């Protein structure tokens, strides 16, 4: 069976007509059997999708026919199975949510650093290296010596900067993220705050892991990705982590050996924080998934939106979801 191509792509570019782009883009992806999520906003496009080699090539060709996206950045990795359940093209205020008005990499952005030059930069003792990802991403892997902002969402990054960094003291700042989009927007924010030398890893961690040999790498651990692969290693090989359905955090083999781990229901991180009602609701959903799997049906996918609605109604009416 041919491998599935997983393409992470984004571009900050002025798209005042972004709403008009949605129908055609969704139709193309559906026709090609592509699954994943694409975000459209006035500031650009962002997303990760998966499909056959021909399908992904067709999507990239379609996007690059628009002169504004002719040089859209994309990174590829591979999976043995489709890592997404359905295709979504969403309209958003921001393609990556910082929550600070007026911040635009289309107007001001930091210095891009190629993976080949990254080790030299972050080995400089005068450079402050910041991981702009969330805490659960940092926990399973990061660059040696990188600062963890301990954020749970990208919206919290400006507060971290305000409390912990000073343009007068931190002369050189280097940032990185999964694919490059968060650190690119963060660099725009940092420049607006008065920082002068702001660098960010071009192509993100994924490009670094693809490009730099493991024996030369300063990366430690695995890189969390937002699909069913959960994490990737050097060479973009699928990592060793799984994911807890309940809290969505990556879980290790040690976590799965815990008495608090129940497949599809809980893990050591969320077990003690989960109400009995929620645990019962998740257990019922897992039961339905297993039934569908035994019947050879897709419980999640085309019917996911319907399930989501039922799930929301069940929370309102205090009943268990039914499918």
From Swiss-Prot:
Pfam families: Rhodanese, UPF0176_N. Keywords: Oxidoreductase, tRNA processing. It catalyses: uridine(34) in tRNA + AH2 + O2 = 5-hydroxyuridine(34) in tRNA + A + H2O. The active site is at residue 177. One of its GO terms (molecular function) is oxidoreductase activity, acting on paired donors, with incorporation or reduction of molecular oxygen. Residues 123-217 form the Rhodanese domain. Catalyzes oxygen-dependent 5-hydroxyuridine (ho5U) modification at position 34 in tRNAs. HAMAP family: TrhO (MF_00469). This is tRNA uridine(34) hydroxylase. It comes from Methylobacillus flagellatus (strain ATCC 51484 / DSM 6875 / VKM B-1610 / KT). The gene is trhO.
């Amino acid at each position: 069976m041919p491998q599935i191509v997983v393409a992470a792509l984004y571009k900050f570019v002025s798209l005042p007509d972004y709403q008009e782009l949605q129908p055609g883009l969704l139709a193309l992806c559906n026709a090609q059997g592509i699954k994943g999520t694409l975000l459209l906003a006035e500031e650009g496009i962002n997303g990760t999708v998966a499909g056959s080699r021909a399908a992904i090539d067709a999507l990239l060709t379609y996007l690059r026919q628009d002169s504004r996206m002719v040089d859209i950045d994309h990174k590829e990795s591979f999976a043995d199975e489709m890592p997404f359940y359905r295709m979504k093209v969403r309209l958003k205020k921001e393609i990556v949510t910082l929550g600070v008005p007026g911040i635009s990499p289309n107007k001001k952005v930091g210095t891009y650093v190629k993976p080949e030059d990254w080790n030299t930069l972050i080995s400089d003792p005068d450079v402050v290296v910041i991981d702009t990802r969330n805490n659960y991403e940092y926990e399973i892997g990061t660059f040696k010596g990188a600062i963890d902002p301990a954020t749970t969402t990208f919206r919290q990054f400006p507060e971290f900067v305000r409390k912990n960094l000073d343009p007068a003291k931190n002369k050189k700042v280097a940032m990185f993220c999964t694919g490059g989009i968060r650190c690119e927007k963060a660099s725009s924010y940092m420049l607006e705050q008065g920082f002068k030398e702001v660098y960010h890893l071009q192509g993100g961690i994924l490009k670094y892991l693809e490009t730099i040999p493991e024996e030369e790498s300063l990366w430690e651990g695995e890189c969390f990705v937002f699909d069913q692969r959960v994490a990737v290693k050097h060479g973009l090989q699928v990592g060793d982590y799984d994911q807890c359905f309940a809290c969505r955090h990556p879980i290790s083999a040690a976590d799965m050996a815990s008495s608090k781990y129940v497949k599809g229901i809980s893990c050591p991180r969320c077990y003690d924080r989960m109400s009995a009602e929620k645990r019962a609701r998740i257990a019922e959903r897992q039961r339905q998934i297993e039934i569908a799997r035994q019947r050879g049906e897709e419980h999640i996918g085309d019917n996911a939106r319907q399930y989501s609605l039922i799930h929301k109604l069940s929370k309102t009416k205090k009943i268990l979801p039914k499918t």
